[in-house]
């Protein structure tokens, strides 16, 4: 006995639903392509200023970046050549002082916000830190001038390091807090379940897990204050010679660049361009270190 099974009938004519949705599909693809193009243009616009600045600094200042620039003191007016050796050394001295002041206070403040503080107290501390992050740098300089320079009766490297360190504190503190909050709570709970004291768990487990993130925040803060000029005008003031005591004025690359840029001498202008290029390379080097640290952390987490 033969059995016939009816087969479904397919039509080659497109359905009305397909005819209505096909244009919508093309329109969605067009909007997606348009959005990609707009975001690409915006990304290029973000990178373009850095490329233009770097190109102009290389064009104007690279010719003056020779061995003398890194090893010699500034020459008097009318003499060509010379360098910014004292300003380069002064910049690292100021950054070292800033790190000594800003890193411990900022890191411990971030630990308090993440591990110990109450919600209301934390809100006020975060609010104060965010406000301090937005305070103009010249205001920092005026405050330290009144509190440090005037009582000491003179500008000094110590005052310059203090103002940069104070500017670092809120940024390091907020970065440390955010990094510590990324550590899974399971680490804390496991440590407490084993009877480990909370402070020891924070120091040896939580902080160690977030160490690279904390270092990243410190480097970002150093990169930010490395190019500050206004607060140093009120504190370090500048010096054309080597500084042997922290109680004496000290040269710094931003100050030297500023002094040379406003001068009427062409040779000093070239030195200013070279100094600006060297300062930009320093900041780029610090930021490159930050990228290496964060990339390694993200790859290991992945």
Give the residues covered by each predicted segment.
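Transmembrane alpha-helical segments of polytopic membrane transport and secretion proteins
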Residues: 1-45, 290-302
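Generic hydrophobic transmembrane alpha-helix motif, especially the helices
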Residues: 130-166
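C-terminal transmembrane helix and the adjacent membrane-cytosol boundary/short C-terminal tail
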Residues: 177-181, 219, 259-302
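Glycine/proline-centered hinge or cleavage motifs at structural transition points of membrane proteins
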Residues: 136, 194-195, 208
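Periplasmic/extracellular loop-to-transmembrane helix junction in inner-membrane transport proteins
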Residues: 22-41, 55-98, 118, 259-270
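Transmembrane alpha-helices
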Residues: 176, 198-234
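Interhelical loop and adjacent transmembrane-helix boundary motif
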Residues: 77-78, 232-280
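Transmembrane-helix boundary motif in ABC transporter permease subunits
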Residues: 98-129, 142, 291-296
